Amino acid sequence: MDRIDVHHHFIPPAYVEAFKTTGGDPSGWHLPQWTPESSLSLMDSHNTRTAILSLTAPGTSILAHSPGASATLAREINLYAAKLHNENPTRFGFFASLPHLTPDTIPAAIEEAIYALETLHADGITLYTRYTGTGYLGHDAFAPLWEELNRRKAVVFIHPTNTAADARNRSILVNPALPQPIIDYPHETCRTAVDLITSGTISRNPDVKIILSHGGGTLPILATRAAHLLYDAKLTSISPEDFLEQARSFYFDLALSGNDENMQLLVGRNGFAKGGHVFYGSDFPYAPVSTINKYVRMMEGFSVQGEEVEKAIARDSAVKLFPRFQMPADLRVGKTNNWGAFSACLLLPVGLSALYSVLQSRVHTYST
């Protein structure tokens, strides 16, 4: 069964250079080695035909101290991602990066989002769970960005980032064996999801499709608790029923979350996620290949809901959200590598258009 990986990171050269000038990842995690070939190798090993690339945290916020530099980095990263897609149209898509978000940089972020979606044909936009100095994604300052994304019916991929930080925005580790991506990131995803609901951002922008990383973090576990406590304590006017409906409107990837317990919670009997709202994700290259392999085996061993749910998670649900990666049915048979044939299908309209232009030119020449 072929897959579409919606949680697959890349590390552009410009991002590596930014890390060198700022002292490394503030989350406490390491910067792995990455090349496009390493992504393709992992994809082939798991029959993944398409990976939608994204920049992990902190993203362009690594240059939060310099808004201009952050905006320049976002553009360089998006151009690099678009180049990878153009060179490998069936294998790579991408979620575009934006400059570090503050109230002052929202206009630049909107400009970059429009450029990425309209000109570079990005598959969506990457946002992080919070931004230093502003807060979580339901903050009033972000409202114009959400309005623009809603107007465009955009897909937004939300990735967690570090929470507690020192004056240099570097993570405060209570235990060096607990880098924030391991434990804290799932909590951050829940926090920003609840913030989006209680701030009214979700209800005001119903046409944005939001993907939460890592199975939604702790949201599926805590949503009912939050829904009732917030309402009963009169901290929100949103009814528990409405709160839970909004919480279930998110999409969820299974990066590092495809174990049996999470699968039962999301897609088992009375699962938290709506049908068609759960996707495969690997978290390559930040997750070790050995860990990715384990989670793939766990997902393949989960069969409570049958083959249709398995196919939906692996590929079909993602195709509905990203139709440009639909593969003709006759090219999906078996496990043969048909990328070249599919590329030919994609490029055929381009060739026909060029042929039409040539013929038109000749007709014009003969007529004169």
From Swiss-Prot:
EC code: 4.1.1.52
Gene Ontology CC, one term: cytosol
UniProt record, GO biological process: secondary metabolic process; terpenoid biosynthetic process
Record-linked InterPro entries: ACMSD, Amidohydro-rel, Metal_Hydrolase
Pathway the protein takes part in: Secondary metabolite biosynthesis; terpenoid biosynthesis
Topology class, membrane: Single-pass membrane protein
Catalysed reactions, semicolon-separated: 6-methylsalicylate + H(+) = 3-methylphenol + CO2
Alphabetical UniProt keywords: Decarboxylase, Glycoprotein, Lyase, Membrane, Metal-binding, Transmembrane, Transmembrane helix, Zinc
Transmembrane segments: 339-359
Top EC class, one word: lyase
Residues modified by glycosylation: 169
Disruption phenotype: Loses the ability to produce yanuthone D.
Binding of Zn(2+), residues: 7, 9, 159, 283
Subcellular location: Membrane
Biotechnology: Yanuthone D is an antibiotic against C.albicans, methicillin-resistant S.aureus (MRSA), and vancomycin-resistant Enterococcus.
Record GO terms (molecular function): 6-methylsalicylate decarboxylase activity; hydrolase activity; metal ion binding
Record family assignment: Belongs to the metallo-dependent hydrolases superfamily. ACMSD family.
Protein role: Decarboxylase; part of the gene cluster that mediates the biosynthesis of yanuthone D, a fungal isoprenoid epoxycyclohexenone that acts as an antibiotic against fungi and bacteria. The first step of the pathway is the synthesis of 6-methylsalicylic acid (6-MSA) by the polyketide synthase yanA. 6-MSA is then converted to m-cresol by the decarboxylase yanB. The cytochrome P450 monooxygenase yanC then catalyzes the oxidation of m-cresol to toluquinol.
Descriptive protein name: Decarboxylase yanB
Organism whose genome encodes this protein: Aspergillus niger (strain ATCC 1015 / CBS 113.46 / FGSC A1144 / LSHB Ac4 / NCTC 3858a / NRRL 328 / USDA 3528.7)
Organism phylogeny: Eukaryota, Fungi, Dikarya, Ascomycota, Pezizomycotina
